């Protein structure tokens, strides 16, 4: 709760090893309202800065929040799923540790991919090494495989990412191109 008010208080929660118990509650707690409180708390920690978000990403919190958000119909309350989605959005929008976001490119539905691709579009232009790593890891190819509706925010983000790579590279990694 205190993480919501100030970035230094959120960092104090991180330094005092508060992420692990919150993540554990998110995964193992049988009561949805406690899971929802844990999701909300994790989102409050991650919303302050890229450093805060990196700690959460390194602890695999985004993947856990995504798993909760994507629970099957009838599992998990609407409140839990809503809080998980909001926490995931808060963390993604601050996360500049792109390698931690790459697994979400495979697992996330399009509404979450919109936030993930927006982060890549924001961070990749300033980081040449990240662009190379993005290609080598398969993340760039995965971006090309996303089925995004024309005119959607997701499509805009993908186009923004592609604009920072040579056209031949984009074509090479696009589906249907023989290698």
Q: Which role does the model predict for each range below?
A:
Residues 139-179:
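Eukaryotic acidic, Ser/Thr-rich intrinsically disordered low-complexity regions
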Residues 18-19, 27, 31, 61-62, ...:
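Disulfide-stabilized cysteine-rich extracellular repeat microdomains
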Residues 8-16, 33-34, 51-60, 75-82, ...:
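Short, hydrophobic/charged alpha-helical patches characteristic of ARM/HEAT alpha-solenoid repeats
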Residues 5, 48, 54, 147-148:
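Bulky hydrophobic/aromatic packing residues
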Residues 21-24, 64-69, 100-104, 142-144:
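Buried hydrophobic core positions in alpha-solenoid tandem helical repeats
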Residues 26-30, 69-73, 105-109, 147:
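Alpha-solenoid helical repeat architecture
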Residues 1-6, 24, 36-48, 67-71, ...:
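Alpha-helical solenoid repeat architecture
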């Amino acid at each position: 709760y205190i993480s919501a008010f100030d970035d230094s208080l959120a960092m104090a929660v991180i330094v005092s090893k508060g992420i692990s118990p919150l993540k554990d509650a998110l995964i193992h707690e049988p009561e949805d309202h406690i899971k929802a409180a844990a999701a909300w708390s994790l989102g409050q920690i991650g919303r302050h800065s890229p450093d805060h978000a990196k700690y959460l990403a390194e602890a695999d919190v985004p993947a856990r929040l995504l798993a909760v958000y994507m629970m099957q119909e009838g599992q998990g309350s609407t409140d839990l799923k809503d809080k998980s989605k909001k926490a995931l959005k808060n963390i993604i929008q601050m996360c500049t540790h792109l390698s931690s976001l790459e697994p979400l490119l495979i697992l996330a539905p399009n509404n979450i991919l919109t936030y993930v691709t927006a982060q890549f579009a924001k961070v990749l232009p300033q980081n040449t090494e990240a662009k190379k790593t993005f290609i080598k890891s398969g993340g760039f190819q995965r971006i090309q495989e996303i089925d995004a509706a024309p005119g959607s925010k997701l499509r805009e983000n993908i186009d923004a990412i592609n604009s920072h790579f040579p056209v031949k590279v984009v074509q090479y990694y696009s589906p249907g191109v023989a290698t």
